[in-house]
């Protein structure tokens, strides 16, 4: 994790995908949120997205924005990030790889389509699936810090933790 002051910490991918389980160990650092220039940034890497607990934990810890660097090959993440942002009222930036890679007998087709998703599920920017793309979006951090869905419902405070399995 890098800020204007330099390297401040690191994050280790928690959930390994496919043959990564043969070569790597899952990350063993607790999920954290980092304050960078007034924004609270949470990180999840690639396949971490498929586990809703990752985004929920980042939201509970106060993340305004989830940074999500990825090498996605499954076609589901970009649509799922709409839900992750909506259910946690956070912004997310998925920076995904494009192109193809052959590793031995395995062929990987990366889905591209990097995107910036708003706290309300609106896609603020969507990249092409097959070419490099750089974009930015202005975000209002007050929106991600307000977990009220309406005047009666708060997405964090209304959780019934005693009813859930861990």
Ranges and model annotations:
Residues 140:
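Conserved catalytic-core subdomain
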């Amino acid at each position: 994790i890098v800020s204007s002051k330099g390297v401040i910490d690191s994050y280790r991918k928690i959930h390994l995908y496919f043959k990564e389980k043969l070569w790597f160990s899952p990350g063993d650092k607790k999920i954290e949120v980092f304050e960078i220039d007034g924004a609270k940034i949470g990180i999840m890497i690639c396949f971490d997205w498929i586990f809703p607990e990752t985004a929920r934990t980042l939201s509970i810890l106060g993340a305004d924005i989830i940074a999500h660097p990825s090498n996605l090959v499954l076609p589901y993440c970009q649509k799922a990030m709409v839900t992750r942002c909506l259910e946690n009222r956070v912004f997310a930036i998925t920076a995904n790889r494009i192109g193809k890679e052959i590793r031995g007998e395995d062929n990987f087709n990366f889905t591209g389509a990097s995107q910036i998703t708003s706290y309300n599920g609106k896609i603020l920017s969507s990249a092409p699936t097959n070419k490099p793309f750089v974009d930015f979006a202005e975000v209002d951090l007050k929106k991600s810090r307000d977990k009220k869905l309406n005047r009666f419902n708060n997405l964090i405070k209304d959780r019934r933790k005693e009813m859930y399995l861990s």
